[in-house]
Swiss-Prot record:
Function of the molecule: Component of the Mediator complex, a coactivator involved in the regulated transcription of nearly all RNA polymerase II-dependent genes. Mediator functions as a bridge to convey information from gene-specific regulatory proteins to the basal RNA polymerase II transcription machinery. Mediator is recruited to promoters by direct interactions with regulatory proteins and serves as a scaffold for the assembly of a functional preinitiation complex with RNA polymerase II and the general transcription factors.
Family: Belongs to the Mediator complex subunit 8 family.
Protein name, UniProt field: Mediator of RNA polymerase II transcription subunit 8
Key word Coiled coil present: yes
Ranges of biased composition (kind: Polar residues): 215-224, 235-249
Subcellular location: Nucleus
Keyword Cell division among UniProt keywords: no
Gene3D superfamilies: 1.20.58.1710
Gene from which the chain derives: MED8
Species assigned in the record: Anopheles gambiae (African malaria mosquito)
UniProt keyword terms in alphabetical order: Activator, Coiled coil, Nucleus, Transcription, Transcription regulation
Coiled-coil region: 1-26
A cellular component term, taken from the record's GO annotations: core mediator complex
Gene Ontology biological process terms, A to Z: regulation of transcription by RNA polymerase II
């Protein structure tokens, strides 16, 4: 007797742990659907669904092993029924069951479908059993026709998408290699650059030595007066003539 009770406790503990994992996975999935419905993607949804499915499979596996006494041979009886609010029961069920009364006990402890749902299910099963072979084959043919039509639409859309993807050009080129090389040659070697030709400059405007006319350096200022108090420079200057080839020409 003690062995059977111990096995029953182990079975109930394993079932309870699996149910808690299942409840947590369902809660996480519902929370994501309520808060991340705009950003959740299909792979994430499938991962959550696969996790729930694995918990259900594990639960069914535990129940199918039937460690000790099968649960189907046991009977669950309520120890206390009251129409008043039970705070301990509310805390135990995490706020789901506040009252365990005579009216609610059959619904909570029911192991079979609701009588109304059971009657509707029986009516559907009877209707399916009374269906003739010809009618069933006709419905199957119509179903296959609809499936084929949907398949053709999807295949055509896939083919159009593949054709569009194959004919779509790659990344558009935003630069020209020839222009880049010409720019580098102009900056580094001066290719293609010419000196600007403009009107004669007036007095007092500084002219580059390479463009200035070849003449000996004059110590006379633009105003025509010789500089006063200027020390002679010991650095020799070499004024290039203007007819020399410009390095950027």
């Amino acid at each position: 007797m003690q062995r059977e009770e111990k096995q029953l406790d182990m079975l109930l503990e394993a079932v309870l742990n699996r149910l808690n994992d299942l409840k947590h996975s369902i809660g996480v999935m519902i929370h994501r659907l309520e808060t991340e419905y705009e950003t959740i993607n299909w792979p994430t949804f499938l991962d959550n669904f696969a996790l729930i499915s694995s918990h259900l499979t594990g639960l069914m596996k535990i129940l199918s092993t039937e460690i000790g006494t099968p649960l189907r041979n046991l009977t669950v009886l309520p120890l206390m029924l009251t129409p008043e609010r039970d705070e301990a029961l509310l805390q135990l069920t995490e706020g789901r069951v506040p009252i365990f009364s005579h009216d609610l006990a059959p619904d909570y402890l029911r192991t079979k479908p609701d009588p109304g749902a059971e009657s509707r299910q029986a009516a559907h099963e009877a209707k399916a059993n009374n269906l003739t072979v010809e009618a069933s084959m006709k419905q199957v043919a119509q179903y296959n026709k609809v499936i084929s039509h949907v398949w053709d639409i999807i295949s055509k859309a896939k083919e159009d998408w593949e054709n569009e993807s194959s004919t779509r050009p790659g990344i558009q080129q935003t630069s020209s290699m020839a222009d880049t090389q010409a720019l580098v040659a102009a900056v580094g070697l001066g290719n293609g650059l010419t000196a600007p030709v403009g009107p004669p400059t007036g007095a007092g405007v500084m002219i580059p030595p390479a463009i200035r006319q070849g003449s000996p350096m004059s110590a006379v200022s633009p105003s025509g007066n010789a500089p006063m108090g200027k020390m002679p420079s010991g650095i020799k200057t070499n004024i290039k003539s203007a007819n020399q080839v410009h390095p950027y020409r």
